[in-house]
Amino acid sequence: MKSIVFVALFGLALLAVVCSASEDAHKELLKEVVRAMVVDKTDAVQAEERKCRWYLGGCSQDGDCCKHLQCHSNYEWCVWDGTFSK
């Protein structure tokens, strides 16, 4: 009788461990899916980037910045150059 109770308790403990491991695996899978979605959106944005840098984008020279922007000498980011042409 004692051995049957011991086997039953051992089986329940084993089942609890397996379920816990399964839940952890599910959480890890969910994290991987979310990471993949974020990476895909980042890649899509990078694919649509222009060859020039937008306002406050990092730069090393004026040619890096888009039209009507220039590279700020101290902070190395693109700022408005003060022009208004179309």
Curated annotation (Swiss-Prot):
Disulfide bridges in this chain: 52-66, 59-71, 65-78
Molecular-function annotations in GO: ion channel inhibitor activity; toxin activity
GO cellular component: a single term: extracellular region
Entry's localization field: Secreted
Signal peptide range in chain numbering: 1-21
Keyword Iron-sulfur: no
Residue numbers covered by the propeptide annotation in the UniProt entry: 22-50
Keyword Cell division recorded: no
Residue intervals passing through the bilayer: none
Tissues where this protein is expressed: Expressed by the venom gland.
One Pfam family cited in the UniProt record for this chain: Toxin_12
Record's function text: Ion channel inhibitor.
Family: Belongs to the neurotoxin 10 (Hwtx-1) family. 17 (Hntx-9) subfamily.
This protein's name: Omega-theraphotoxin-Hhn1b
Record organism: Cyriopagopus hainanus
Lineage: Eukaryota, Metazoa, Ecdysozoa, Arthropoda, Chelicerata
